[in-house]
């Protein structure tokens, strides 16, 4: 099997397991009576921890191969939460001394995300 297809299968399998895990966490930790999304917060924080742990092991040891990193960091964490990848990319920019770009990415994603969400909702209202 060509390497690209194997990588695609690893990411897909990890994503399936990650998305399933996210769904299960949402069942166990719903809005615990307060209206606060504890399940989403737990998933986002756990995903940040996992992608940091996996990425560091892949750099500083031979415990995590490139294939295992694809399965766990890109696949599982990507299916579990995209927030972890976002935080890792910001940290990578900061580590590389790219303060301007890390700040632009951080604020641009938050403000841009909120604006895109709003405009998407408004467009959907026109069609509904």
Swiss-Prot record:
Entry keyword set: Cell inner membrane, Cell membrane, Ion channel, Ion transport, Membrane, Metal-binding, Sodium, Transmembrane, Transmembrane helix, Transport
GO cellular-component term (any): plasma membrane
Catalyzed reactions per annotation: fluoride(in) = fluoride(out)
Activity control, per UniProt: Na(+) is not transported, but it plays an essential structural role and its presence is essential for fluoride channel function.
Residues at which Na(+) binds: 78, 81
Location(s), subcellular: Cell inner membrane
GO biological process: cellular detoxification of fluoride
Topological relation to the membrane, as annotated: Multi-pass membrane protein
Membrane-crossing residue ranges in chain numbering: 1-21, 45-65, 70-90, 99-119
UniProt xrefs under InterPro entries: FluC
Gene Ontology molecular function: fluoride channel activity; metal ion binding
Family, as annotated: Belongs to the fluoride channel Fluc/FEX (TC 1.A.43) family.
Described function: Fluoride-specific ion channel. Important for reducing fluoride concentration in the cell, thus reducing its toxicity.
Protein name: Fluoride-specific ion channel FluC
Organismal lineage: Bacteria, Pseudomonadati, Chlorobiota, Chlorobiia, Chlorobiales
Gene that produces this protein: fluC
